[in-house]
């Protein structure tokens, strides 16, 4: 009986913590970015499906660091890369980069 109760308690704790740490978009702006097929194909692998960031792979796009960047800074980062961020100038059209920039700015309410 104790084993059963311990299993139920551990499972309950696991699910409670999973729900606590689950990251879902806090507003429609993240959903707009992550619904963009260009984002899904080129960005989500490192920045996460909901732009939450993926530890060492890529930072959150809804963060103080991203919020501090101007549209030109974001555009340059996407086009030219920096550090572990690959270059996308040859892979994406300028209007696709601009759409990503605008959506990142919206997430950060600029």
What are these regions (language model features)?
Residues 1-29, 110:
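N-terminal export/targeting leaders of redox proteins
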Residues 16, 37-40:
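Processing junctions and N-termini across compartments
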Residues 31-36, 48-77:
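Gly/Gly-Pro-rich "capping" loops immediately C-terminal to redox-active cysteine motifs
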Residues 34, 56, 83, 94-95:
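Surface-exposed, polar/charged faces of alpha-helical domains
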Residues 39-49, 100:
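The canonical Cys-X-X-Cys-His
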Residues 50, 82, 107-108:
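A general structural signal marking secondary-structure boundaries and capping sites
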Residues 72-88:
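Short Fe-S-cluster ligation motifs
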Residues 78, 90-110:
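C-terminal capping alpha-helices of c-type cytochrome domains
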